[in-house]
């Protein structure tokens, strides 16, 4: 099994999992917006447009991943999950080719200075240090996309109860 947590969220209850099952933070049900607009409110929407274009190049127009990013209201945030290693490998096979193509398309060359320059150039927000983490925000949406479309997500709430 493999687990990822960020500094603000910790999955304290975990157990053996079947293939295709993932423990996550509780999904956010967005009644008033969709993933695409949620991203647009706080980040550079052209990053999302690039990502969906890359996904369409890889998986074809109208694929389930692009449909999720453009239309879905359920968001599994924070990049917190526990899953079997085989499922993690599949997630990586989905995620990293998209991020690598995004990096190349935007001439970032995996160089932090280039990310800062990009944030200054195309961000409508004053907090460049926040916006320069574009790949992290994009990754969070892509991980949510993959888990939502390919796996059964189980949320473990701090009381130890599960919500599906």
Predicted regions and their residues:
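ER/Golgi luminal nucleotide-sugar-dependent glycosyltransferases, focusing on the catalytic module
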Residues: 1-164
């Amino acid at each position: 099994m493999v687990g990822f947590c960020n500094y603000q969220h910790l999955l304290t209850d975990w157990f053996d999992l079947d293939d295709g099952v993932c423990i996550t933070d509780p999904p956010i049900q967005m009644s008033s917006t969709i993933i695409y607009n949620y991203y647009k409110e706080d980040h550079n929407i052209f990053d999302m447009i690039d990502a969906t274009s890359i996904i369409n190049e890889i998986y074809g127009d109208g694929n389930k991943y692009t449909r999720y990013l453009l239309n879905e209201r359920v968001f599994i945030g924070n990049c917190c999950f526990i899953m079997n290693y085989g499922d993690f490998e599949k997630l990586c096979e989905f995620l990293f080719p998209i991020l690598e193509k995004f990096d190349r398309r935007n001439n970032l060359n995996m160089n932090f200075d280039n990310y800062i320059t990009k944030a200054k150039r195309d961000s409508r927000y004053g907090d460049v240090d926040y916006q320069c983490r574009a790949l992290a925000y994009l990754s969070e949406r892509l991980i949510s996309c993959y888990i939502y479309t390919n796996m059964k997500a189980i949320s473990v709430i701090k009381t130890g109860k599960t919500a599906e």
